């Protein structure tokens, strides 16, 4: 999977687990040079409760894991491989 960079996931929904046992689900808008994330349309899940948060900046140091649906990952990988094969 080292063919993809985090910036390749912009526009896709990510599931981000944070150090405070919180989970954020939102669409990746941007990644800065320090690998901080900007997510939009974010739903925060904590235990059995959840809330909508809108646009959220996520510091890299608070991220434990980042997940994406497998079919989306496979499609992104296939698109990137095809794009790289067509570069002259």
From Swiss-Prot:
A single BP term in Gene Ontology: mRNA splicing, via spliceosome
A GO molecular function term, named singly, is: mRNA binding
The record ties this protein, via InterPro entries, to: LSM_dom_sf, LSMD1_Sm, Sm, Sm_dom_euk/arc
Q: Note the Gene3D superfamilies from the entry.
A: 2.30.30.100
Q: Which domain of life is it from?
A: Eukaryota
What is an example of a Pfam family matching this protein? LSM
Q: Which residues form the Sm domain?
A: 1-72
* Cellular component, GO annotation: cytosol; NatC complex; precatalytic spliceosome; U4/U6 x U5 tri-snRNP complex; U6 snRNP
What does the further note read? Present with 2140 molecules/cell in log phase SD medium.
Q: How does this chain assemble?
A: Component of the N-terminal acetyltransferase C (NatC) complex, composed of the catalytic subunit Naa30/MAK3, a large auxiliary subunit Naa35/MAK10 and a small auxiliary subunit Naa38/MAK31.
Function (record text): Component of the NatC N-terminal acetyltransferase, which associates with the ribosome to acetylate nascent protein chains in a cotranslational manner. NatC acetylates protein N-termini starting with methionine, followed by a hydrophobic or amphipathic amino acid, with amino acids at positions 3 and 4 also contributing to NatC recognition. The first 4 amino acids of cognate substrates are recognized at the Naa30/MAK3-Naa35/MAK10 interface.
The protein depicted here goes by the name N-alpha-acetyltransferase 38, NatC auxiliary subunit
Instruction: Report the source organism.
Output: Saccharomyces cerevisiae (strain ATCC 204508 / S288c)
What phylogenetic lineage does the species belong to? Eukaryota, Fungi, Dikarya, Ascomycota, Saccharomycotina
Underlying gene: MAK31
């Amino acid at each position: 999977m080292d063919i993809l960079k985090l910036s390749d996931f912009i526009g896709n929904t990510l599931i981000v687990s944070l150090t405070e046992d919180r989970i954020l689900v939102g669409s990746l808008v941007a990644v800065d040079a320090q690998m901080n994330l900007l997510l939009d349309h974010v739903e925060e899940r904590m235990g059995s409760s959840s809330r909508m948060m809108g646009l959220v900046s996520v510091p890299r140091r608070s991220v434990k894991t980042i997940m994406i649906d497998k079919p989306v990952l496979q499609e992104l990988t296939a698109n990137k491989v095809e794009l790289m094969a067509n570069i002259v």
